[in-house]
C-alpha cells in the first residue's frame, strides 16, 4: 500500500541499501507514499529531510557511504548519519568513511557485516586544516559528478587519506 515500483503523484523515491555505492546512489525504481505515522519504525523526519546527510548500507562487507543533499527517503537497509563534527566538512568525513583505512578499522574492531552507528562513531577521523579538506572535497565532487570509471580517482583519493593517517 505504501511501497510501489511505479511513480505516482503522491509518492517519492525511496532508497534501499543496495542503491548505495561509494559516493553515489543508483535508485532502483522504488517509491514510497511517505506517511510516517503509519509506519512501524521511522527515523525522525528531520533526518530524512536534512539539508545534507550521509546514507550508508546497513549490511555490507565494507563501509559504503553516499552523500545526499536532496532529502531522499530511505528504507531500513539504508541508514542515515549526519556527522556534526566541529571544523570538519561533511564531504571530507564522507571521504574518510569510504576509505580503506576506515574499512580496515571496522573489519579489525568489529566482527559483523552490520554497520552500526556506534561502529561509525569509533572510526578515528584525522583533523586537518580547511585547505586540506577543500582538496579532498574537490576530489569527492569529481568522483560524485563523473560519468566515467572512477576507480583511478578513488585510488588516488584513498592514497591521500592513508597519508592523512600517517600510514604511507
PLM region descriptions:
Residues 1-134:
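Polybasic, glycine- and aromatic-enriched phosphate-binding surface used to engage nucleic acids
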Amino acid at each position: 500500500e505504501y511501497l510501489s515500483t511505479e511513480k505516482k503523484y503522491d509518492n517519492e523515491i525511496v532508497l534501499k541499501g543496495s542503491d548505495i555505492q561509494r559516493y553515489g546512489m543508483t535508485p532502483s525504481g522504488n517509491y514510497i507514499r511517505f506517511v510516517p505515522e503509519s509506519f512501524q519504525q521511522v527515523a525522525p523526519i528531520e533526518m530524512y529531510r536534512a539539508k545534507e546527510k550521509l546514507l550508508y548500507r546497513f549490511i555490507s562487507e565494507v563501509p559504503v557511504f553516499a552523500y545526499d543533499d536532496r532529502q531522499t527517503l530511505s528504507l531500513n537497509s539504508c541508514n542515515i548519519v549526519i556527522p556534526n563534527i566541529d571544523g570538519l566538512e561533511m564531504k571530507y568525513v564522507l571521504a574518510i568513511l569510504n576509505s580503506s583505512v576506515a574499512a580496515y578499522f571496522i573489519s579489525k574492531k568489529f566482527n559483523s557485516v552490520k554497520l552500526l552507528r556506534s561502529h561509525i562513531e569509533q572510526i578515528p577521523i584525522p583533523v586537518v586544516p580547511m585547505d586540506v579538506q577543500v582538496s579532498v572535497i574537490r576530489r569527492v565532487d569529481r568522483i560524485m559528478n563523473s560519468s566515467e570509471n572512477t576507480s583511478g580517482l578513488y585510488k588516488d583519493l584513498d592514497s591521500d587519506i592513508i597519508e592523512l593517517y600517517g600510514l604511507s
